[in-house]
């Protein structure tokens, strides 16, 4: 380790430009492929969808040859832009413009027939539409939670987020939106008419995304196949004998998870995790002691915490034990629609980058959740 004096003696130049190993497009390609692992991939996809590009979402792996004769393998989540499906779009020029804006690799394929896995014309290539996303706001809804999601979608993905005041929901045609996000807040003031409005939209094909305490309302409404455990579970766990009035601040503090890192076991084959990680574990940033338990149904749980999940920061041992083996991510069908539950603030303050793409996946990958 260098001392400050030794470090000052190092002759170095500032980095003013980041060199990216970009992949030039080949004009004779049959199709182009955008892998999903890059953090900028959602922004590129949003840009192309806004320009009317026909996009196919890969839901199974495949291997093919590029126009230079290289053999390339692609994981689920890769986006395919087929030249034949884009007769009204100058695809080559549009993709090059996107590459100029976002230095990222887009690969050129020589043929629609693959060496291994699905072909480009397979029904496992799902068509994607431009998402139209709204989030409930208003009295009783956490502005911090809304702001964190808005910041990610607006500044990093370039996806416009519509703010819907829940008190004016009756005046809104929800069919104008593909996704609706519900964050921490109070929603018991939504009357039966507005509840039925959301449920009808959901059953007809909408995607409902819940986060943190917004999940309590989704569970109470019977839309979420998971149960939010009572706050008394945490309160009782940290209660100690002979507690006095002077101990009340300690008692309250022990219940809090005010910003610590917890490790979850994840399913990297699940659409919510495509392009996020290839590992079996992923650290989540927790800011609450919310406990979610998914129903005992196959494949709806995309992530759950390890037995003793705390890896950084402080969480009372009793609460850490309670968090262990509870659910972090859930996704399932509801009629023709989908419900996605995200326990933690995956876009917390715009700096916890490891989980931020889960929000993008909840939007762009939702057609693959079956």
Model-derived segments and spans:
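Intrinsic-disorder/low-complexity accessory segments
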Residues: 1-370
């Amino acid at each position: 380790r260098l001392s400050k004096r030794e470090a000052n003696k190092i002759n170095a130049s500032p980095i003013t430009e980041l060199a990216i190993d970009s992949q030039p497009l080949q004009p004779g390609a049959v199709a182009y492929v955008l892998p999903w692992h890059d953090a900028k991939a959602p922004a590129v996809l949003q840009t192309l969808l806004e320009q009317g590009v026909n996009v196919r979402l890969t839901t199974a792996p495949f291997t093919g040859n590029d126009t230079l004769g290289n053999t390339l393998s692609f994981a689920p989540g890769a986006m395919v832009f087929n030249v034949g499906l884009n007769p009204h779009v100058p695809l080559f020029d549009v993709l090059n413009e996107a590459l100029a804006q976002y230095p990222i690799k887009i690969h050129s394929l020589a043929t629609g027939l693959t060496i291994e896995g699905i072909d480009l014309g397979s029904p496992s290539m799902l068509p994607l539409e431009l998402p139209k996303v709204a989030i409930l706001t208003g009295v009783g809804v956490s502005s911090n939670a809304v702001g964190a999601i808005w910041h990610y979608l607006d500044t990093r993905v370039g996806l416009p987020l519509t703010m819907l005041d829940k008190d004016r929901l009756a005046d809104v045609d929800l069919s104008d939106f593909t996704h609706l996000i519900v964050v921490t807040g109070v929603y018991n003031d939504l009357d039966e008419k507005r509840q039925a409005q959301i449920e009808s939209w959901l059953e007809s094909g909408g995607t409902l995304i819940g986060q943190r305490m917004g999940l309590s309302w989704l569970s109470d409404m019977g839309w979420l196949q998971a149960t939010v455990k009572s706050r008394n579970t945490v309160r009782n766990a940290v209660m100690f004998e002979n507690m006095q009035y002077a101990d009340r601040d300690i008692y309250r503090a022990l219940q809090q998870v005010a910003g610590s890192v917890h490790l979850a076991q994840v399913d990297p084959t699940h659409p919510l995790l495509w392009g996020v990680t290839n590992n079996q574990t992923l650290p989540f940033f927790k800011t609450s002691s919310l406990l979610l338990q998914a129903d005992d149904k196959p494949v709806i749980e995309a992530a759950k915490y390890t037995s003793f999940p705390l890896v950084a920061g402080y969480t009372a041992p009793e609460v850490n034990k309670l968090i262990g083996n509870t659910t972090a991510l859930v996704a399932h069908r509801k009629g023709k629609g989908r419900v996605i539950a995200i326990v933690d603030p995956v876009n917390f303050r715009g700096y916890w980058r490891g989980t931020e793409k889960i929000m993008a996946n909840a939007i762009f990958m939702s057609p693959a959740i079956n």
